């Protein structure tokens, strides 16, 4: 009726029902009704893993405990170094970066170069592009060494095996690529055909990373999951949920105990590879997380985002340590410097350490859609050097293990090599 409100309609309906069925036949409940849930409640749940996953977790636990023990020994030794030694090492590592310049630009593909990665011995640079092609280039001449027509869609993930080019047989797995076709391919240095193709993701594969052991590989995907693979057996070991949107970035801690994932939900998560549980939630970015990199010290992590910032996280304090206003546009990639020599000391027969202080982790680089590559010190988070190209968006960056070069992949279908003239 005109002007009738909801209580009036209820009263009128009550009178109609009483007149029709009698007062005793009608039961009216005035208890408030709980609103229907449009969405399922978020809850933590666990899925029983396979026996193969159990074996993998045990192997990763044994590996990580030994690596952590050696790293702790190294850090204890470095803690006794004098301030003069630390300052001299810092100057030796950072001062040359200030004179870096563009050594050359190379057209790498028919479409944007989405990812660049140096081989562990810094003798090769691998590039992946939106054309689905992966290429190898010799360093420092940037001459082509091989091309792999890897995928039917854009390559968005590329990673070198930890022992590639430094002891791995040429016929063994040296590299892996992931792409928009949902597949991950593993490659040797002897053939332009993949050794294996890992399938399981239901959408685009983004960043990928090898576990430091080299036996396992993690992949992030737009299907909202990241997965763990046994690369030797070409077998999926685990499907991990935990993000409300697409998962873009993935990286392993140096000793292999932790793995970090970052999503387009602006949330990052640090997972314990030995138990599968979440160790830390990275909540602070305003937009999607595009890059993740663990520091060689094992307890710090840098994330980069579409909010133009890089955040430094401390895994011991479980919080964000510092926010760097890194670029004027999205920060697409981040990589720490890891020295070619082992970051862990060798020991004399009498048990004394023989290596000098390691340069690993003293600085890192970020790539931005503002056309810049920036190098930052990893102790005070200050800008050391800004490298500007002329090709628009910089989509990826990497640092060579010999400390001589920086490589950047660009929207303009090219990659640049930076260093000393």
PLM regions: where:
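Short, well-ordered alpha-helical segments in soluble proteins
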Residues: 212, 233, 244, 254, ...
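WD40 beta-propeller repeat fold
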Residues: 77-242, 249-251, 281-283, 322-326, ...
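Nucleotide-binding motor/catalytic cores of P-loop/tubulin-like NTPases across gene-expression machines
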Residues: 382-383
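Intrinsically disordered terminal extensions that flank WD40 beta-propeller domains
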Residues: 1-111
């Amino acid at each position: 009726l005109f002007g009738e409100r909801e209580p009036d309609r209820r009263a009128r309906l009550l009178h109609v029902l009483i007149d029709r069925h009698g007062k005793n036949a009608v039961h009216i409940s005035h208890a408030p009704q709980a609103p229907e849930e449009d969405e399922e409640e978020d809850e933590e749940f666990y899925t029983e893993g396979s026996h193969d996953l159990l074996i993998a977790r045990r192997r990763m636990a044994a590996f990580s405990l030994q690596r952590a023990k050696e790293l702790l020994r190294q850090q204890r030794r470095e803690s006794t170094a004098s301030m003069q030694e630390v300052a001299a090492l810092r100057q030796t590592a950072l001062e040359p970066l200030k004179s870096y310049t563009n050594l050359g630009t190379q057209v790498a593909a028919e479409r944007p170069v989405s990812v660049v990665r140096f081989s562990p011995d810094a003798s090769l640079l691998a590039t992946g592009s939106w054309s689905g092609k992966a290429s190898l280039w010799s360093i420092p001449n940037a001459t082509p060494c091989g091309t792999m027509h890897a995928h039917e869609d854009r390559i968005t993930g590329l990673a070198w095996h930890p022992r590639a080019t430094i002891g791995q047989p040429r016929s063994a797995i040296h590299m892996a690529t992931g792409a928009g076709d949902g597949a991950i391919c593993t490659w040797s240095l002897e053939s332009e055909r993949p050794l294996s193709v890992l399938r399981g993701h239901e959408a685009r594969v983004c960043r990928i990373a090898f576990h430091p052991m080299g036996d396992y590989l993690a992949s992030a995907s737009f299907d909202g999951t990241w997965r763990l693979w046994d690369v030797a057996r070409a077998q999926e070991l685990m499907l991990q949920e935990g993000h409300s949107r697409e998962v873009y970035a993935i990286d392993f801690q140096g000793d292999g105990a932790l793995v970090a994932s970052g999503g387009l939900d602006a949330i990052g998560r640090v997972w314990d590879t030995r138990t599968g549980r979440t160790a830390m939630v990275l909540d602070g970015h305003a937009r999607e997380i595009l890059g993740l990199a663990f520091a060689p010290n094992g307890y710090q992590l840098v994330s980069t985002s579409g909010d133009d910032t890089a955040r430094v996280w401390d895994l011991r304090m479980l919080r964000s340590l510092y926010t760097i206003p890194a670029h004027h546009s999205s920060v697409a990639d981040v990589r720490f410097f890891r020295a070619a020599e082992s970051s862990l000391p060798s020991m004399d027969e009498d048990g004394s350490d023989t290596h000098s202080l390691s340069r690993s982790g003293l600085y890192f680089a970020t790539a931005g859609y503002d056309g810049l590559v920036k190098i930052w010190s990893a102790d005070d988070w200050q800008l050391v050097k800004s490298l500007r190209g002329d090709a628009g968006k910089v989509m990826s960056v990497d640092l060579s293990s010999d400390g001589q070069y920086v490589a950047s992949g660009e929207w303009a279908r090219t990659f640049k090599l930076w260093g000393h003239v």
